[in-house]
């Protein structure tokens, strides 16, 4: 029996995984620019058809087939250099760009190049000894996810793409330069080495697409993790990194004992991944256990899949390219259906997307387990991926801890005087570019004590996966409460400079609408010994939805129950003649604009507003002194600010 050894931090082994890790991180960053650009730039500002958006997204998946002719006609070295450099250059240029149109096309080209790189890299590592090919593929993939989340964590969940200046460009340039050095240092086989595998060995690669769906929407999404687990956004980032460490531990275990992942265990893993995916929207601390266990299982599965897929049979990359392209097509399709179900009436509920992704990845695990028994065991246990993951995890953990102690929330010990209502459009401005700093500056300059936010995302993939709740709270030094209305990460929030006594939320009547609505409330102590009730809401949006808005307004009145003092703010999607407004005014709430506003009070669309749909309503014991529409295009709505006082 061959003795097995344990290797400590092996820099040469990490170097063998580093190129795949960096390209993966850059590819995911480009993908998170592409999907929002399709929605917010091409669709919202350029009125592109949905079919056009779907076609462009599908092209990035189909692009993987280009690996076949590139490998054949350019050879191993030139094809890897060309495609790898394309990803790096596209990412760096996108970082420099401030133009949404240029962002769109750079991210499109960069994402397509990333899809081409995947089969090229797998073909390349197959030319190495079989015991190195698998770890280089899986280790690079999982470390890439870890690196990507570490960079986001350092920026409080905001992608570096949306941060201007030289500071975010510096680490990206260093990583790109290191990648070029790694490409130069690679050993390239002469001629046309065996680079493709049998169909039974590459079939499990189909699991990559569904796996990335679960990672991008849930497991690498600190906002989703925080909202579902019921923890602070900072803890959400830590939990994401802990999940990545669990995945790396599972991968190392899988590589050290590949023969243990037999079909029976593969079946159990597949069932667990499928069943756990049904619980990803269920709030509670149990989500943390699901996150860590699922990530560990995913890491073990990837060890088995990569060892199986790294086996070689013949030259070319036909099977590998086709399977990985199909995998990325599955990713695009599942992600599209998850978000399209909020806008299009589909024959199934969007909640099936996660179980479907878990099922496909689980089947990939089961299939790979049938082949894993034939894979030889490595004579060494390589712990270096865990060490690297731990180092990457400590970076945001330490930085966020320093932030927490150096920048505590600033608290006012007085009665609130200014309130703001702002539909922030997920921080996308009228040009289709995400700029949360512009939103923060609007709120900051308003001097508002309490802010009711609508259309705030904690990490929708089509919104750039930014946890705006956590980011704005940290940036402004304000307390925050949030509750999703359609899933855990999209809904309403309240920012406050005052202590929040208690808070809660409830859904509003939905009818047959696709997008769920609700209201969020908080209570604050005032100088008169009472409690100020503050409510923020966002009502149904369609032009033919007046009756549903009336029902939703009735629900708000029932909750309010004539308590005083109280303030109701929000995007009501209704102008003065509508029944919903009548319900609120007849119940005894007073329109702050009618009392103290100058002009017509139009708030939407922000560029050239022609509708008054954003409201602040006060109870009779409060009087609006000044009501102002703030002229800004940081969102597609203009915010509404009211300075008020207690009536004598």
Write out the residue ranges for each language-model feature.
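Active-site beta-strand/loop signature of hydrolases that rely on acidic residues for catalysis
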Residues: 26-65, 239-244, 417-424, 435-465, ...
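Surface-exposed cleft-lining segments at the edges of enzyme active sites
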Residues: 229-235, 426-428, 508-510, 538-545
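A generic structural micro-feature
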Residues: 414, 513-516, 607-609, 634
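N-terminal post-signal-peptidase region of extra-cytosolic proteins
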Residues: 431-437, 465, 598-606
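Metal-dependent phosphoester-hydrolase catalytic domains
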Residues: 3-10, 29-45, 57-60, 69-70, ...
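Structured beta-strand-rich core segments of catalytic domains in phosphoester-bond hydrolases
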Residues: 402-411, 424, 431, 450, ...
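N-terminal signal-anchor transmembrane helix
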Residues: 375-378, 388-441, 445
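Pair of pore-lining "gating" transmembrane helices in MFS-fold secondary transporters
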Residues: 14-27
């Amino acid at each position: 029996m061959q003795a097995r050894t344990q290797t400590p931090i092996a820099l040469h082994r990490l170097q063998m995984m580093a190129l795949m890790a960096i390209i993966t991180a850059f590819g995911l960053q480009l993908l998170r620019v592409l999907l929002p650009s399709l929605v917010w730039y091409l669709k919202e500002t350029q009125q592109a058809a949905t079919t056009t958006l779907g076609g462009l997204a599908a092209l990035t998946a189909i692009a993987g087939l280009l690996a076949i002719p590139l490998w054949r006609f350019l050879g191993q070295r030139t094809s890897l250099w060309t495609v790898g450099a394309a990803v790096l250059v596209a990412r760096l240029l996108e970082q420099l760009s401030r133009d949404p149109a240029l962002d769109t096309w750079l991210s499109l080209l960069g994402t397509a190049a990333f899809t081409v790189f995947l089969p090229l890299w797998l073909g390349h590592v197959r030319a190495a000894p079989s015991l190195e090919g698998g770890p280089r593929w899986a280790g690079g993939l999982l470390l890439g996810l870890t690196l990507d989340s570490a960079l986001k964590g350092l920026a409080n969940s905001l992608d570096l793409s949306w941060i201007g200046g030289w500071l975010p460009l510096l680490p990206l340039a260093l990583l790109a330069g290191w990648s070029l050095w790694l490409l130069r240092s690679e050993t390239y086989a002469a001629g046309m080495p065996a680079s493709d595998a049998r169909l039974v060995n590459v079939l499990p690669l189909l699991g990559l697409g569904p796996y990335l769906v679960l990672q991008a929407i849930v497991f690498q999404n600190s906002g989703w993790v925080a909202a579902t687990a019921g923890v602070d956004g900072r803890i959400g980032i830590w939990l994401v990194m802990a999940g990545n460490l669990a995945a790396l531990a599972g991968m190392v275990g899988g590589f050290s004992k590949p023969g243990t992942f037999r079909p029976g265990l593969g079946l159990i893993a597949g069932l667990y991944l499928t069943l756990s995916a049904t619980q990803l929207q269920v709030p509670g601390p149990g989500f943390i256990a699901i996150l860590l266990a699922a990530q560990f299982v995913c890491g073990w599965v990837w060890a088995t899949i990569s060892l199986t897929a790294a086996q070689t049979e013949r030259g070319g990359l036909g099977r590998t390219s086709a399977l990985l392209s199909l995998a990325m097509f599955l990713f695009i399709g599942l992600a599209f259906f998850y978000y399209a179900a909020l806008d299009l009436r589909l024959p199934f509920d969007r909640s099936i997307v996660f179980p479907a992704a878990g099922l496909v990845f689980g089947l990939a695990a089961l299939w790979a387990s049938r082949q894993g028994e034939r894979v030889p065991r490595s004579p060494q246990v390589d712990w270096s991926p865990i060490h690297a993951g731990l180092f990457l995890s400590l970076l945001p953990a330490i930085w966020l801890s320093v932030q927490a102690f150096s920048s505590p929330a600033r608290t006012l010990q007085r009665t609130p005087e200014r309130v703001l209502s702002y539909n922030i459009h997920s921080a996308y401005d009228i040009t289709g570019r995400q700029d949360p700093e512009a939103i923060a500056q609007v709120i900051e300059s308003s001097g508002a004590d309490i802010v009711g936010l609508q259309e705030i995302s904690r990490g929708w993939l089509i919104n750039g996966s930014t946890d705006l709740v956590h980011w704005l709270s940290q940036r402004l030094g304000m307390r925050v409460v949030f509750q999703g209305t359609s899933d855990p990460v999209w809904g309403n929030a309240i920012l406050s400079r005052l202590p929040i006594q208690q808070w809660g939320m409830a859904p509003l009547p939905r009818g047959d609408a696709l997008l769920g609505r609700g209201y969020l409330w908080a209570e604050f102590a005032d100088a008169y010994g009472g409690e100020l009730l503050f409510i923020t809401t966002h009502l149904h949006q369609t032009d033919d939805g007046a009756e549903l808005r009336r029902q939703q307004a009735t629900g708000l009145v029932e909750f309010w129950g004539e308590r005083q003092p109280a303030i109701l703010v929000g995007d009501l999607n209704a102008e003065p003649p509508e029944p919903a407004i009548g319900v609120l005014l007849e119940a005894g709430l007073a329109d702050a604009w009618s009392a103290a506003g100058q002009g017509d009070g139009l708030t939407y669309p922000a560029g050239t507003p022609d509708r008054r749909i954003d409201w602040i309503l006060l109870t009779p014991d409060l009087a609006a002194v000044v009501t102002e529409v703030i002229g800004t295009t940081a969102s597609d709505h203009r915010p509404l600010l009211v300075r008020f006082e207690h009536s004598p």
